């Protein structure tokens, strides 16, 4: 007896929205949004407490942290050039981070609305292979959140360790009432405070950077599932080709094709929910990535000592995580959409009714329209844009290196 791959029980149907569980737990910890079922959503008292917590977190990250970085440069007279550059490469990110936080927090309802479209697409899954693909995606996305958090925490920890080895605070932030040069005790207090500030900032940064990668990956999975269903058009439940089906089977094939067209429209609506959010946050990141990478490479190859080089290299890898994975997923989404159009050609359309072929032509026309994501309608979000930014930052480093600033600075000192 052939083993059927159909699953009839509703309880076994996976949910793509579970891929965002760890992500929204991070948003919850940052005071951005309380998930359904949490205490702030079930108790008015906890709702007020969480609202106060959110205000404190927003004031801290949007106002105080950038202010600490900016004011610190008024007191940079006693700082070494490596310390200035280490602080500057992070300060660029910290000062621009509020724009990303505001853009993301303002558009969180759009991301939540996307879950309704995902639920409609998940309901179309019928085979165990489809369920397994969704479960693997859920597992990967939740692990990816931890991967980002760990990578950013490694940078923060490495900078903290290097600070103690060099006897200087990690970023020499302006902290009222503290002068790290006055005593060893004040140095230790300042270093620990900066470490905590940077860890919290990294939590924000990692959450703001990973969400786009996760959402685009989930959309890619839905496109791949749709392509699998389209390829099976014109076949029976066992996968056997029906070249000249009877009238009843032709109607069933037409109905399945209609459902695939509706799935494609739902997928486009899903993209309409998430693309404006990604557009705004990645635009901000594109604007500063070249400056950050250029500053970091100048620090690594010209001024930094061995300990600072290690921390700066880790930071450069973290900066790569801010844009490269999102650009990769956007490029892969375009390729998956092209494979969807090819899947239409591979379905069993020969011998089908005229109505089926007309609908298939309409579907082919819609599917051949490319899915292109843009950053504020100015820059395409793809790997070509990322490599252009990387080339520009390397050109900036080459220009600075050609000016022999390192030798001039050493002669001056």
From Swiss-Prot:
> Which superkingdom, per the lineage?
Eukaryota
Q: Which residues lie on this side of the membrane: Cytoplasmic?
A: 1-50, 111-144, 208-281, 331-369
Q: Report the locations given in the UniProt record.
A: Cell membrane
InterPro entries according to UniProt = 7tm6_olfct_rcpt
Tell me, in one coarse class, where this protein mainly resides.
Answer: membrane
* Membrane topology label: Multi-pass membrane protein
Record bears the keyword Zinc:
no
Instruction: Write down what this protein is called.
Output: Odorant receptor 7a
Q: Which organism is this protein's natural source?
A: Drosophila melanogaster
